[in-house]
């Protein structure tokens, strides 16, 4: 049975600026990884979390799996960026659409995600293979977005060619549906990610 929507949480970054093991850094009493996981769980969206190889120890893995009972995967090849994480997620779960979220955005909320998902019917009519929030200045949020399973063959080809692994390059083949970022959240705070120890402390 094919699920309509599944989630992919990208947790493959090294997180060197935050001291490593970024998904399990504590922010306001919760691991960073718990924020997107809690939202997906609350919406009953099945999801997979993709980690970098050797990035978490067995105790962390066990604790996370016990809490969320989700699937986990690891980057098949290191150093390929978020495209590899999306590829791994799409291979693990059988869904028509995938909502891709980063592990380091603690301000994500349920309403914003529901608004993003509400655009699927428009994308289906227009043959868009992805739905991407876009800011007024043209900046896009490709890691807080939806990708259709039909994009998997394109993604496979790009990774196999290994010439341009930019996510913008990938999106250029997908006839993207751009939606206004402020329509998801007027403050745009949901897109703020935590990259350093200072940001971890300042934002508490």
UniProtKB/Swiss-Prot annotation:
Q: Where does Mg(2+) bind?
A: 104
Which GO biological process categories is it annotated with? Mo-molybdopterin cofactor biosynthetic process
**Which residues of this UniProt protein bind GTP?**
10-12, 22, 75, 104
Catalytic activity annotation: Mo-molybdopterin + GTP + H(+) = Mo-molybdopterin guanine dinucleotide + diphosphate
Q: Which InterPro entries match?
A: MobA-like_NTP_Trfase (IPR025877), Molybde_CF_guanTrfase (IPR013482), Nucleotide-diphossugar_trans (IPR029044)
Q: Which GO terms describe its molecular function?
A: GTP binding; metal ion binding; molybdenum cofactor guanylyltransferase activity; nucleotidyltransferase activity
As cofactor, the record names: Mg(2+)
Keyword annotations for this protein, in alphabetical order, are: Cytoplasm, GTP-binding, Magnesium, Metal-binding, Molybdenum cofactor biosynthesis, Nucleotide-binding, Transferase
Q: Provide the E.C. number(s) assigned to this enzyme.
A: 2.7.7.77
Localisation per UniProt entry: Cytoplasm
Q: Could you name the domain of life of the organism this protein comes from?
A: Archaea
What Gene3D superfamilies has UniProt attached to this entry?
A: Spore Coat Polysaccharide Biosynthesis Protein SpsA, Chain A (3.90.550.10)
The protein's matches in PANTHER family, at most eight in alphabetical order, are given as: MOLYBDENUM COFACTOR GUANYLYLTRANSFERASE
The function of this protein is: Transfers a GMP moiety from GTP to Mo-molybdopterin (Mo-MPT) cofactor (Moco or molybdenum cofactor) to form Mo-molybdopterin guanine dinucleotide (Mo-MGD) cofactor.
Question: What family is this?
Answer: Belongs to the MobA family.
**What free text does the record give on domains?**
The N-terminal domain determines nucleotide recognition and specific binding, while the C-terminal domain determines the specific binding to the target protein.
Name this polypeptide is given: Probable molybdenum cofactor guanylyltransferase
